[in-house]
Amino acid sequence: MKTKIFCDSADYKSIKKLSNRTLVSGFTTNPSLMRLSGAKNYKNYSLKLLKVCRGKPISLEVFADSFLHMVEQAEKINSWGKNVYVKIPVINSRGNFSGKVIKILCAKDIKLNITAVYTVAQVRKILKTVNRNSKVIISIFAGRMADVGKDPIPIIKDSVRLAKKFKNVKILWASTRDTL
């Protein structure tokens, strides 16, 4: 397994600086980070970030909660660049699995980053939903698990083992706060 490092930020200066470094393989951000970085317009700020990413993958998240609006936003976000991965939460605020959204977007060959994943059961559901062609990142919130005293390492190991059967799926240790 080859380890890749992604920068989790929306800070324009940091992304511009790190885009030139071979150590950083890609970027991931979300609407909250963008707001903290001073973004006033999500699309315009995203396009600004895309200009400095130099073709490296960048994950840009939908902010809709309904599945219909997630699909609509994902299609728009996907159109912004060839290196865009659209971030979709594994569940919406009502706790419903985003499987239909994932299936629709994979059928349209939209690269996805399924985010806010906490369990191996969620990883299994995602893997049953994706096709074997679309590129998919599964972002496991290891840092947040550790924050509440749960060891994320067994979940990461099991998830990597399950994802090895899919050449198009990568596991991302996400929401990092500390080294474990």
Where are these regions (language model features)?
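Catalytic alpha/beta core domains of metabolic enzymes, predominantly
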Residues: I110-L180
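Active-site beta->alpha loop and helix N-cap motifs at the rims of alpha/beta catalytic domains
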Residues: M1-K16, R21-V24, T28-I104, K108, ...
